[in-house]
Amino acid sequence: MKIVRHIPNTITSMNLLCGVLGVIFTFRGALDIAFYLMLAAAVCDFLDGLSARLLHAYSNVGKELDSLADNISFGLLPAMMFHRRLIEGGVTGFVAYIPLIICVFAAIRLAKFNVDENQSENFLGLATPACALWCGSLIYAADHGVMSFAMMLHDTQIIPIASVVLALMMVSRIPMFSLKFKKGSAYNRIRIYFVVMVVLLAVATAILKINWSYIVLVTFTAYIMLNILTALFSLRFTK
C-alpha cells in the first residue's frame, strides 16, 4: 500500500495550491475568493495531519512540505490580502508594505516549530493558520455587512498595527493550546470548552442573522485572548 503513504503529502500539496491560487486572486482584487481558498487551505492543513496519524504515514519530507505550504497559505496570502486592502484604500509608500512582515515572521515561526520538540501537543506563539484566518475573516467581515469592522478598516493605521502585533505574537513564547484533540491529553477539557463556545457563538450568529465570517473572526479573537489571559494568570500564580 505504497500509495496510501502519499495521501498526507497529496493533501498538503492541495493546501499549497490553494495558497498560491489565493495569492493570484488577491492580485486580481478578488479578496472574497482568496479568503475561500484560505479556508480550503486550512481544511487541508487539518486533514493532512489527521490522515498522517490515521495511516501512520509520517515522514520528514511531509513535515517540511507542510511548513512550506503553510508559509504560502498562512504567511504570504494574508500578508498580500492586507497589502491589497491598503492599496485599495489609497495607502502608498512604506506603510502599504508593512503587512509583508506577516510572511517573514510566519516563516520564522514555522522554522522554530520544526526544530522545537516541546511543541508536539501545544504551541509557543500564535499558530500561522490562526493568524491567517483572523486576517482573512476581518477583511471578509468588513466587506460583507459587519459595519463595525468596515468602519475599523477605514482607519488606515489598523492593518499596519495589526500586522506588527500578529507577527510578534507568532514568534513570541506565549503558550497556546492546540485545537487538535489527543488521547489522554490534559488539555482536552479546555479544547472541549472552546468548541462549546464556538458552537454557541454559531447558534447566536444564526439567530441574529450575522454574516458567517463573524464566527471565524470572533473565534480566533477569543482563542488569542484566552491564551494570553491564561498565560498572564499562570505567570501571576507562579511568582
Task: Give short role names for the model-derived ranges.
Residues M1-F46, A202-A206, I210-T219, Y223-K239:
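Topogenic membrane-insertion module of multi-pass membrane proteins
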Residues I3-I11, C18-L31, Y36, G90-E121, ...:
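"…together with the soluble PPM/PP2C metallo-phosphatase catalytic core" -> "…together
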Residues L21-Y36, L76-Y97, L138-I158, A206-S213:
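Helix-coil boundary and interhelical linker segments in multi-pass alpha-helical membrane proteins
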Residues H56-N60, I87-G90, N114-E121, F149-A150, ...:
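Membrane-interface helix caps and helix-loop-helix hairpins in membrane proteins
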Residues L124-K239:
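C-terminal membrane-associated helical module and adjoining short loops/tails
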